[in-house]
Amino acid sequence: MRRIVALRRIIWDAAGHFNDDDGWAMASYLAISALMAIFPFLIFATTLASFLGAQAFAETAVHLVFDTWPEQIAAPIAREVVTVLTVQRGDLLTYGVALAAFFASNGIEALRTSLNRAYRVVETRSIWYRRTQSLGFVLIATIGFVVISILLVFAPLIARFLEANFEWIKPYMGTITLWRFIIASTVIVLGLVAVHIWLPDGRRPLLDIVPGIIFTLAGWLIGSTLFATYLDNFSSYVTTYAGLASIMIAVVFLYIVSVIFILGGELNASIRRYLDARAKVGA
């Protein structure tokens, strides 16, 4: 009974603060910022990958970003992304690519702002530190994607070698699609851990952010599945928005994702507040 009461208090605190502190508006801000950051990030990443010799990066990047999205949502956007990424561009250090990196970092700043609100902290770090950190996130993500794309190029060769020399491993190899999904899911988990630890002001132990990350992953899975089912069976987006349907679908999907992401931070903050209150009472 005590656990039920505690769980209810935590959920009520998280949901109440989300509602009272403009959580719905912050989710809109985060969704639009994410949509505006995806294309600049992929343009910057593709240009850097080409500079480093990873010519097949565009297709791999699209898979890594969109493999975990429902197909009904990802397919129209992925086609446009591939079209954008296959356009030939100039050298790495052009103004356009530098601006792409800057606009991509705006998405990181949106994550920071929403998490600061969720964790109920006031930002104390300088704008230069924050911008440098955001650009660092973009650069690290880009390098990570390049490394993964190179590994996926060699994956079939490695798989054939392992299957030829280790018969017992065949049932566990799966398909390239499966491995892409596993890698994309791993990238998401590591990304969530990184943004919860380093983006908001202050410091939080790893154990403090685990509940919110689990909630976020479960919420994204359930939310995307329900939205995909809705699109399959009930949606009139195509007739209502015509050529804008794919953009509207992406915006609504990212809004759902953003609400769940912010609620994950709210949940972590509420659990910490509850535990701190219990500790004071015990003292």
For each feature predicted by the language model, list its residue ranges.
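Membrane-embedded alpha-helices and immediately adjacent juxtamembrane helical segments
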Residues: M1-A283
